[in-house]
Regions:
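N-terminal, polar/charged subdomain of small-to-medium soluble alpha/beta proteins
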Residues: 2-161
Length: 161
């Protein structure tokens, strides 16, 4: 079994300086206590498609020991008007930081189910990025051990504040 931390114990952020930029210091951001996905129908979006992460998740011991590729696609819902008007990264969400945070989170933690990995990732993003109103995460497992040829197995979840 891996010596990786469980999500409940995760409070430390690791990574490059790039991965720390843009988190929680967005001057124009206002956290919204609760929204629904109906509220986000016309919201602005940051889209990250096909982020590849090598991590150790799975029900079978071999998956945890050897690791495998996961492919993450994200939609972050936020008000990006100020970023567009002022051409300022400080008024937006740094997608480079988001990518590094997702990569670090999935490498740092071990889950049996990709449903749990997606849920933990969604909650981490909502905590670290106060201007994110909601998130859609698609987490694919292209090397899923099902014994048949397939392109990928995965889950897609949506979470809001």
């Amino acid at each position: 079994m891996s010596n990786k931390k469980r999500p409940e114990n995760a409070t430390k952020t690791e990574g490059t300086e790039l991965a720390r930029r843009g988190r929680g210091d967005i001057s124009t951001a206002t956290a919204v206590p609760h929204v629904s996905f109906d509220d986000l129908r016309h919201a602005d979006r940051i889209v990250i498609d096909g982020l590849e992460v090598f991590a150790n998740h799975g029900v079978y011991p071999e998956e945890n020991a050897l690791g495998q590729k996961f492919v993450v696609s994200l939609v972050l819902y936020a008000d990006l008007r100020a970023a567009g008007e002022h051409d300022s990264l400080d008024a937006s969400i740094d997608y480079g930081s988001v990518c590094h945070d997702v990569d670090g989170y999935l490498r740092e933690h071990t889950f049996k189910l990709i449903e749990a990995a997606a849920e933990g990732t969604a909650q981490m993003l909502l905590r670290r990025y106060p201007s994110v109103l909601g998130v859609r995460i698609k987490l694919d497992k292209p090397w899923a051990p099902v014994g048949l040829p397939l392109a990928s197995c995965g889950v897609e979840i949506e979470r809001v504040r």
